[in-house]
């Protein structure tokens, strides 16, 4: 299983990389724009925040296949082993095929259906990113889409992985993992929710209180 953070917040990545067994960091144009740092600045900073390890993902902005390929080359000039995110449009599928031929790893993004995701994998995408919560918001089932896509990739494109994205709750993320999803990327608020349990804090406080009462200290 691979766990990613979906953010461009360098400080948060550095802090959470101490805690989480991170495989890397994913970004998209909206995330980069919110951070107000250009790619050539923030991508190296994110790489350094992870101790020079882990995979980074960044997305193309062009809408034609040729433009997407040029964007991918620019991204690879910033971070040599970056995974290039390509929206799974008709032009995006063509770009994924072209990038596969160049040996540039890709992630098919903006996936709203299992068939769409399968096509990106067959075109050569190493990862496929279904938008779980956004599918739910449109009246579909994000978890069912992940389940179907996982089965399709297992049967027809076994070298590709589902990297589920767009979560609002830890439950959605866990349900994806239970469905067999190999990778997930979490926004910071959902990542924090996964390790924030008030009952745990209360239990630890009670342990300390009892130990202090018996031995006059809180150390062993």
UniProtKB/Swiss-Prot annotation:
The scientific name of the source species is Escherichia coli O157:H7
What is the stated purpose of this protein?
Catalyzes the reversible formation of fructose 6-phosphate from dihydroxyacetone and D-glyceraldehyde 3-phosphate via an aldolization reaction.
Looking up InterPro entries in the UniProt record yields: Aldolase_TIM, F6P_aldolase, TAL/FSA, Transaldolase_3B/F6P_aldolase, Transaldolase_AS, TSA/FSA_arc/bac
Give the active-site positions. Answer: 85 (schiff-base intermediate with substrate)
> Keywords for this entry?
Carbohydrate metabolism, Cytoplasm, Lyase, Schiff base
Q: So what EC number does this one have?
A: 4.1.2.-
Protein's recorded name: Fructose-6-phosphate aldolase 1
Q: Which PROSITE patterns match?
A: TRANSALDOLASE_1, TRANSALDOLASE_2
Give the family from UniProt. Answer: Belongs to the transaldolase family. Type 3A subfamily.
Cite the Gene3D superfamilies for this sequence: Aldolase class I
- A GO BP annotation: fructose metabolic process
PANTHER family assigned to the protein according to its UniProt record, in alphabetical order: FRUCTOSE-6-PHOSPHATE ALDOLASE 1-RELATED, TRANSALDOLASE
First-listed, main subcellular location of the protein, grouped into a coarse class? cytoplasm
Q: Which CDD domains match?
A: Transaldolase_FSA
* Compartment annotation: Cytoplasm
Q: Which reaction does it catalyse?
A: beta-D-fructose 6-phosphate = dihydroxyacetone + D-glyceraldehyde 3-phosphate
Name the NCBIfam families for this protein: fsa_talC_mipB (TIGR00875), PRK12653.1 (NF009296)
User: How does the record describe its quaternary structure?
Assistant: Homodecamer.
- In the UniProt record, the gene name given for this protein reads fsaA
Show the taxonomic lineage: Bacteria, Pseudomonadati, Pseudomonadota, Gammaproteobacteria, Enterobacterales
Q: Which GO terms describe its cellular component?
A: cytoplasm
Q: Which GO terms describe its molecular function?
A: fructose 6-phosphate aldolase activity
């Amino acid at each position: 299983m691979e766990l990613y953070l979906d953010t461009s917040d360098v400080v948060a990545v550095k802090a959470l990389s101490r805690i989480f067994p991170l495989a890397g960091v994913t970004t998209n144009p909206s995330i980069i724009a919110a951070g107000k740092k250009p790619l050539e600045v923030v991508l190296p900073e994110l790489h350094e925040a992870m101790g020079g390890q882990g995979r980074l993902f960044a997305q193309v902005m062009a809408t034609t296949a040729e433009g997407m390929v040029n964007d991918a080359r620019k991204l690879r000039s910033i971070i040599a082993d970056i995974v290039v995110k390509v929206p799974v449009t008709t032009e995006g599928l063509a770009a994924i095929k072209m990038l596969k031929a160049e040996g540039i790893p890709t992630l098919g993004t903006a996936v709203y259906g299992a068939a769409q995701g399968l096509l990106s994998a067959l075109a050569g995408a190493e990862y496929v990113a279904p938008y779980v919560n956004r599918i739910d918001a449109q009246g579909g089932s994000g978890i069912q889409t992940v389940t179907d896509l996982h089965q399709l990739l297992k049967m027809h494109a076994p070298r590709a992985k589902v990297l589920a994205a767009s979560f609002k709750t830890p439950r959605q993320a866990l349900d994806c993992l239970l469905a067999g999803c190999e990778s997930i990327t979490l926004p910071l608020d959902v990542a924090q929710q996964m390790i924030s349990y008030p009952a745990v804090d209360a239990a630890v406080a009670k342990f300390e209180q009892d130990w202090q009462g018996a031995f006059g200290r809180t150390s062993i």
